Amino acid sequence: MQYKTKAKKSLGQNFLQDENIIRKIVQLANIKKDDIVLEIGPGLGALTRYILKCSDNVNVVEFDASVIDTLLQNCQKYGEPKVFNEDFLKFDLDIVRADSQQKLKLIGNLPYNISSPILFKVIEQSDKIIDAHFMLQKEVVERIISQPNSKTYGRLSVILQYHFDCSMILNIPPEVFYPQPKVDSAILRLKPKANKLVINDYIFFENIVKQSFAQRRKTLHNNLKGILKELDIDPNTLPVDTKLRAENLSMEDFVSLVNFLK
């Protein structure tokens, strides 16, 4: 592997350089020959090389044009990925699906400074993917997989768990990166739920969840009183106890609440 390119702090770049960890990540992604794979932020191609060994259809979206030559050089012995020098947040997944209805496998060492926007983009496209394996700050992964009544349980937990089965499948120490980040990392697996709960108004669901967690120490009654007043709804008639805080409600509770309100 060549590491000629200096990592850019502004893009949240930290390049993987431990071959054992790299192999393990790709192995856990369980990529098959006929899978269409889309890697987000391949950087210098650490993961890409091993993905090319597994699949005949490897696509990468890389925002930083300055790393692409090195990426392709590092991949030479393994094959050639199709490179899109674009911002993933504006990228159309249907481009790599071509005319097929085949779903994609997503993988990537995500830039930590924009991981949340990327995750929300993946939510929007969840019907087009088989699964996703992302390296993220461990603290973020812990928030995503958190359960109710936990300090780390929040908006991201509820929204992602509505769409996906979420699990942390590998811990990754800072020393396997160049440059070393100041935090631990982890691999998050997202698998779209086969039977999602029905929501009458999904945008309203997102708004209710966001508003409920707006001030964590406040009760649902205080956080939602403006919305309840606007809808002319008596808090005592709701299917959840408004004296509770948002962190006490399960994802299913939020769905029940939203379907009652709309």
UniProtKB/Swiss-Prot annotation:
It catalyses: adenosine(1518)/adenosine(1519) in 16S rRNA + 4 S-adenosyl-L-methionine = N(6)-dimethyladenosine(1518)/N(6)-dimethyladenosine(1519) in 16S rRNA + 4 S-adenosyl-L-homocysteine + 4 H(+). Specifically dimethylates two adjacent adenosines (A1518 and A1519) in the loop of a conserved hairpin near the 3'-end of 16S rRNA in the 30S particle. May play a critical role in biogenesis of 30S subunits. It is an enzyme of class 2 (transferase). Belongs to the class I-like SAM-binding methyltransferase superfamily. rRNA adenine N(6)-methyltransferase family. RsmA subfamily. PANTHER family: DIMETHYLADENOSINE TRANSFERASE (PTHR11727), DIMETHYLADENOSINE TRANSFERASE-RELATED (PTHR11727:SF7). It comes from Francisella philomiragia subsp. philomiragia (strain ATCC 25017 / CCUG 19701 / FSC 153 / O#319-036). The lineage of its organism: Bacteria, Pseudomonadati, Pseudomonadota, Gammaproteobacteria, Thiotrichales. One of its GO terms (cellular component) is cytosol. Gene3D superfamilies: Ribosomal RNA adenine dimethylase-like, domain 2 (1.10.8.100), Vaccinia Virus protein VP39 (3.40.50.150). Pfam families: RrnaAD. Transmembrane segments: none annotated. S-adenosyl-L-methionine binds at residues 14, 16, 41, 62, 87, 109. Its EC number is 2.1.1.182. Keywords: Cytoplasm, Methyltransferase, RNA-binding, rRNA processing, S-adenosyl-L-methionine, Transferase. This is Ribosomal RNA small subunit methyltransferase A. The keyword Methyltransferase applies. HAMAP family: 16SrRNA_methyltr_A (MF_00607). It is found in: Cytoplasm. InterPro entries: KsgA/Erm, rRNA_Ade_diMease-like_C, rRNA_Ade_Mease_Trfase_CS, rRNA_Ade_methylase_Trfase_N, rRNA_adenine_dimethylase, SAM-dependent_MTases_sf. One of its GO terms (molecular function) is RNA binding.
